[in-house]
């Protein structure tokens, strides 16, 4: 799945690791992800779409760290991201030193549901990235300019909201929400 990176997505900090590759590549990728200080480790089901997935399909363990959102990041997020990279390099024995301590005890997310908009219109989300959700809960509505509901986005499973569009404008076939299914959300540290 190819997904154009947007600057209108709100996301919680998490890390993708290669999941559609040889077992040893997946194992090494997950081990790399485990040294990143985020609440969730997300196993990617894709073998293409993004450089980290392509690397995995070529036998190269890889991860994608998601931190910051809407094209904005704080100094703290930059420092956390840099420390994450240093920890991965330490794990790989490319950089000397001990892997630094972590704030989070990450939860595994192996099944992610990606929902794209079926209509162009105005998006009204009901949740925030990092919120837990229950199957059947309304995650948001797409309305026209007159307030008529064009689409209702409903959670297909219990889980945690990884990211969502937060702009008023939403485009047909564009990303709307992504959430991890059946996650033991009680174990997730709030970021």
Model-derived regions, located:
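Structured catalytic-domain cores with a bias toward divalent-metal coordination
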Residues: 1-191
